[in-house]
Curated annotation (Swiss-Prot):
PANTHER family: NADH DEHYDROGENASE [UBIQUINONE] IRON-SULFUR PROTEIN 2, MITOCHONDRIAL, NADH-UBIQUINONE OXIDOREDUCTASE 49 KDA SUBUNIT. This is NADH-quinone oxidoreductase subunit D. Belongs to the complex I 49 kDa subunit family. Its EC number is 7.1.1.-.
Amino acid sequence: MADAAAPDAASVRNFTINFGPQHPAAHGVLRLVLELDGEVVERVDPHIGLLHRGTEKLIEQKTYLQAIPYFDRLDYVAPMNQEHAFCLAVEKLLGIAVPRRAQLIRVLYAEIGRILSHLLNVTTQAMDVGALTPPLWGFEEREKLMMFYERASGSRMHAAYFRVGGVHQDLPPKLVDDIDAWCDAFPAVVNDLDRLLSDNRIFKQRNVDIGVVTLDQAWSWGFSGVMVRGSGAAWDLRKSQPYECYAELDFEVPIGKNGDCYDRYHIRMEEMRQSVRIMKQCIAKLRAPDGQGPVVVDDHKIFPPRRGEMKRSMEALIHHFKLYTEGFHVPAGEVYVAVEAPKGEFGVYLVSDGSNKPYKCKIRAPGFAHLQAMDFLSRGHLLADVSAILGSLDIVFGEVDR
């Protein structure tokens, strides 16, 4: 009689559920359609595009200067890193060299962006698996870093601080001193987070051996950044293809060996320490005699003259007017430039037709390649592991949907 009541295998169907787009663990407007066999994930289908604004098409209708703010709105957790890639691409086409002080300021703020991103990711990943204290600590430090953004550019998030040929304005000495003081205090916060999470039994159970990627699989899927380093490859564009002044800076590239969520967490923790190390070196070089000087190229066909000069010189006024009405013209050609953004390799493929607007600007967002592997990473795991895997990918939808 008991056997008759038991359902046969054919009548047990998989069921489909929606995860997001308003789920707090979805990290933005992600919708996952999950096919489950009981608690086990059979298939994951990410539905993207809910934050699509047509950024690449909009850039084609703007001058090179007007295009910069669009890059802040891609990975809006670490905005200046994206501006960096675009400015480097335009500079390569123009064939101009950025002054040394501007390079140091750019690298300093790129590393601040890296810490902003990793702090948010590590602490919200902990929240995804049930720890509520880390986000409170992380946001306290992020607030201080956003104040540094604001003091340099006037904006906490969408800075638009980098310019083709340098940065918009120099850093006041007091700001450099305050960043230096923050760098001295921050490692203690990372150590506190480390003590709270790294040996926590529940955190390890939720992350160890979850979302494992071998190195060959990582290359096949087009992974970059932490996703590749977690699988054992010391691939970091700051070391392997140095840009700006990274070649003269001393820092380590942390790598994992298991390729799971726990290794990726550890790499982000160590990268924050290395970023502080880079920032300290940049600050020392900014204070040194050879770190003084202009923060932008001295070419008024690319960067406008100073206000004082415009009050004295008609030629300077004409340069200013032409720059802000028409913009500068970039020689025809095409170039691909990639930077090591916090999420991975952020690339800009820029095509110029010799006019004052980009003919095409293709954006290579690292999060896009990582999210497309969500089905491969989650298959066979439990439903509860999906949010842990998603957290370890570090997805931001500004850059995925663009």
